[in-house]
Every structure is written in C-alpha cells, then in structure tokens.
Amino acid sequence: MFPQNGAKVPEIRFNGFTHDWEQRKFSDIASRESISRESSYDLPSLEYEDVIAEEGRLNKDISLKENIKKGIVFDGSQVLYGKLRPYLHNWLNPDFSGVAVGDWWVLKPNNADKSFIYRLIQTQRFDDIANQSAGSKMPRADWNLVSNTEFAVPVSQEEQEKIGEYFSSLDHLITLHQRHTDFYKKTSCYFISS
C-alpha cells in the first residue's frame, strides 16, 4: 500500500486512483504540537508505559490515573509518536484528549489524513529515518532530520483516507482474533487443570 524502492505508486492500490504519489517533506504533511499543560481529570496523562509497543493500543484505562504530570496537550486530532528509542515503536492514534508525558511527538496533520499519517510513521522508511538518532544509551529521533525527509504521499486525500481505514480495519480484526485466541487458551488451561 506504500511505494517501494523509489516507485511512484504502490504495487497494490484501490480502484479509481491512478495519479502518481508525490514526494513531500514530512513537515509539509505534519507539524509538531508544543502546547504544554498539567494533566487533569479531563486531560489524563499518557506515558510510554501506557501504550503497547508495536500495537498502538492502550494497556490500561488512563482516565483512572490520578497522578498530575506535565506534558504536550493533544485533542484526538493528532497522532502520537514516541521519539525516545524509536526502535521500540511506540505510537498511538488517539480518539480522546490528554497530555502526552515524556518523549512524544504530538503530530498534527497538515492537509493530510490523520489515519494516513499514523500508518506512514509505521513504515520501514520512516523507521529507518527516525532511528538515525543522536545518543547511544537513550537515542531520540531527530525532528530536523525527520521533518526534512521526503515521503511518498497520495495526491488525493480520499486515497489517504482509504489507506488509513484499510489498516484500521485490519488492526480491528487482529485484535478480535487475538481476544478469541486468548479466550480459548484460558478455557483450555481451565479444563486441563480441572
């Protein structure tokens, strides 16, 4: 669904889209938010430990957290990318408001679809760039490098939306199947131990 090896279009594509994708700097399709504030009941804090790495899902109900922490405000219209140790693949596509505590980039889409940006930050190309980082013990992705890197982007926002929706549907199916698998494992263990 993303162009490979310098191609102008991906090998697999939705019907009705024929235009070449264009090369755009990341800073042209997403900008970093920087408004900081303390967390509260209405704006729960979100930390690295709250997100399942490589899955982009919360591992707890963060609205139940009581500690007050300062971080970057997000309102659900942005994508979160963990810049600390980018090889850990911490990312989140929130549909709620909160405060991103720690080393998160809060990425606001600029003339681009939020779900597409969320998928773009998971590509191998983005990962390769983000991991060209400074620091050996605590490497961090370099915004200057990432923001000035060009990525292939569909001209049509409708195509961006379809790509985002497609991968969101796949994630949903995977989660459902994982829940079923977990249920059957627990059931099996119960019967074996009985």
Where in this protein do the model-derived segments appear?
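Feature detects amphipathic, helix-rich regulatory segments
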Residues: 1-194
